Structures are given as structure tokens and as C-alpha cells.
Amino acid sequence: MTTQKSEPTPSSAQWLRRFVNVEPGEITALLASFVMFFTLLSAYYIVRPVRDEIGVSLGKDALHQLFTVVFVVMIVLVPLFGFVAARFPRRLVLPSIYIFFALNLVGFWLAMRTDGRNVWVAGTFFVWASVFNLFVVSLFWSLMSELWSHAEAKRLYGFISAGGTAGALTGPLLTQGFIKILAPVDLLLVSAFLLTASVAAGFIVRRRKSGGGAETDAAGGGILDGAIKVFTTSLFARIALFVFLANIVGTFFYLEQARLVASTIHDSAARVEFFSGRDLAVSIATFLIEIFGTARVLRHFGVTTALLALPVTAAIGTLLLSFDAALWVVAAVMVAERISAFSLANPAIKVIYTLATPDEKYKVQNFIDTVVFRGGDATSGWLYSSLSGGLGFAASSMGAVALPLVLVWVWVARRLGADHQERAAEASQAA
């Protein structure tokens, strides 16, 4: 991979190196990657309050059905994405899909402006937003794993991830600012603008990292290659199982928290304050760890340690929940779990993908990030509903039920780390 020579001035480069171990020729591409993820998640976190408000207005029963629809839509979209990835040059896949989603936002804006109370429009937007989030983030990391090498990823993915966290913090602030002068539906246009800006940053990243070169051919292969490789390749099967278990356990904590909040905090404004305070704590801690800690953990302690941080945190959380099923316990566990997921486990998995082939980076990663991810959500929802409703398990018993899953998750993390080491060694020898 080559880089062009136009880079920031020495003084700005020296300032940046205080936070990240970046080489002189990588600075522009790194900053563009940061900005790309920043604008992408800012766009989503502007859309999310609109989606959540629609969810509340549609009601609890409709939400359960909509999440099932989201999972089905994910399954349908996988072969369509496989077709696009197989037939079109990789340099066009991401910008084309991002622009398509931006046009969708404009379309929803027009529809909601015309008939904002239409249940079908509202339900469709809720499903769309849930799909949009996973697809655009998955495509972003596919691009990153294509353009950054394995060694570069260990040094730089923490900083790039911090761009997304900064976007997650900025999006709600932009919403609070714009909502004073715009109607809620007009926020969709702001989101569309930021998504388009993310495309522009993506072009800069690719140009700087590939030098405008030839790493842009279509991935080729069949439309279901991603799904097939997940079930036939041990490395990808373990990544999928890791993500699946992470979502089962994470959704379990989420649903238990929702139950405790409903029974403990009865004022709507107080609930909003509780959730916003939790999210703010997660975002600030995650940002600081991504800037100052993620790269150090990946380089000095390895991918396995970063992967283990998440299931070990969850294991401690389930034990605490077994002894004291209080709201503050669940909230503290969720904060710790999300911090370890965003700042350590997720970057570690993205590092593993840098060792994959171009075909795998797009098709396999997208299948796991969408279908497997939402499959974990759906499974956890049904499992939690069965245990708490049909079988009448108490909250303390629920923690004990989740513990075996978490222990399996720890084992999967260790095996996944070992698989990564083997593939990294093979790649090093081949080089």
C-alpha cells in the first residue's frame, strides 16, 4: 500500500503522536478515517431519537413484532449485498450504499412531512433505521480492514474507534441544538448531510492508502459466500459465536434493566435522565480508553486479552446480579460491559478481519455484523421472555441462568484469540 506525500505540518503531526503511534505517511488517512467514523455515527445518533420516539408511539406489542421484522429483513438483504459485493468494484460499494441510505433519509423526510402519523411510514422507518445502523458501520469496518494492515490496525484502530465514539457524543448534542429551530423530522436531512460527508472522507482514506491504485476489483464469488464461510471456517465461526453470545448476554442485561427501571423509576423525565447519564458515562470512558489504552492493550497484551475483557466483565456482572438484583447493579454492569465492548473487544475483532481476504472482509464481516448480531438480539428476547414470564424466574435466578452462557463465551474468546495468532503467524511467514 502506498501513500501520497502531502501530509499535515510537522507541528500538528507531533501533536497527534502524543495520542497515537502514527507514522508520518499515515496521518492524513488516519484523520480521514477518524472523521469518516465521526460523521457516520453522528448521522446515526441524530436518527436514533427519531426512531426511538416512533417506537414509543407504536407501543410495546408493535416493537416486539418490528424487531422480528428487522431480523427477517437482515436475512433477505444478505444475498442482495453479496450480489453487489461480487459484481461491483469495491471502491464503489461503500459510497453507493451510503448515498442510497442518504437518499432514503430524504425520502422518509418527504413522507413524514406529508403524512407524519401514517403507521406504515413510522413502522417502515423504525425497521429501516435498525438495518441502516448495522449495515453502514459494518461497511465502514470492511473498508478499514481492506486499507489498513494487521500491524497498522493494532496501532491505529483505537484512535479510529474514538472517532465513532466522539460522533456518538456529538450526534445527541446536535439534536438538542437543532431541535430548537427545526421540526424533529427535519433532523433526517441533517443526518443525510453527515452521511454524505462520511462518503467524502472515505474517498480521502482510499486515495491516501491505495494511492488510487488497483485494490478496487469486485470481490467476485457467490452471493451467499459470506454465510457459507461463517459455517465452514473455524475462525469466522468463532467470531460469529462470539458476537452471538455477546448479544444474547448484552440484550439480557438490557431487558433486565428495562424491567427494573419500569418498576423503580416512575417519572418519565427521571427515566430519560437515568438513561442519558448512563450513556454519557459509557461514551466518555470509552473515548478515553480508545485514545489512550486500546492500542497499548492490543500491542502489548494481544488480541486475546482484549477479547477476554468483555466476557470476563459479563461473568463478574452475572455473579453480582445473582447476589443483588438491584437497578444500580445492572446499570453498573451494563456500563462496564459496554465500555469493554466498544473500547477493547470490538477493535480486537476488527483487527482479526485485517487478515481476511478482500471477499471475506466484505461478505463475511457483513453477515456477522447484521444477521448474526440481530439473531442474538432475537434469541435473547425470546429466552428472557420465556424465563421471566413462562417459567417465572426471579431476577437473581436469571443471573445464574446467564452464567453458563458467559463461561462458554470466555472459552470462545480464548479459542478465537488462538485462531487469530495462528492466522497472523501464517500471514507473517507468507510475507
Feature locations, PLM:
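Substrate-agnostic recognition of the 12-TM MFS/MFS-like secondary transporter fold
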Residues: 28-81, 121-179, 218-229, 238-294, ...
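C-terminal transmembrane helical hairpin of 12-TM major facilitator-type secondary transporters
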Residues: 305-344
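A membrane-interface helix-boundary motif in multi-pass transporters
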Residues: 89-93, 176-193, 277, 301-306, ...
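Conserved MFS/SLC helix-loop-helix module at the cytosolic interface between two early adjacent transmembrane helices
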Residues: 78-97
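Membrane-embedded alpha-helical segments of multi-pass transporters/permeases
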Residues: 79, 106-110, 169, 196-204, ...
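Intracellular loop-helix junctions on the cytosolic face of multi-pass helical membrane proteins
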Residues: 1-34, 60, 87-91, 102, ...
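C-terminal ends and interior cores of transmembrane alpha-helices
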Residues: 99-118, 312-326
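Residue-level recognition of pore/gate-forming positions within transmembrane alpha-helices
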Residues: 71-74, 98-105, 192-196, 247, ...
